[in-house]
Amino acid sequence: MTRGMPIRLLSDGDRFELRASADRSAFVLRSKTDFYVAHLLGEDASRFDADYLAVQRQHPAWKPDQALGQLWDHGGYMWFAAQEAE
């Protein structure tokens, strides 16, 4: 996915998990309850990074599931997702 770059855990909740490359050029947003995952690269990763930082600034007290759920549902990132392999 990221040409050998490690992906580290950035945010983790009961419903959602977010991983990112060190340079934030790639993100993996996962819905744990729905078993879907969105791989975001290039321009999609840049847009997601800006949206994620904006949600964090606007709602600093939100827990990971609130922030990531907002991006998943209302940010439209669920449309980038595919069902996880079994």
Describe these PLM feature segments.
Residues 9-10, 32, 51:
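General secondary-structure edge motif
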Residues 41-86:
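Mixed-charge, Lys/Arg-enriched low-complexity segments
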Residues 19-47:
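A short, structured beta-strand/loop element
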Residues 1-23:
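Short, charged/polar N-terminal "headpieces" of proteins
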Residues 7-8, 38, 66:
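Intrinsic-disorder/low-complexity peptide segments enriched for small residues
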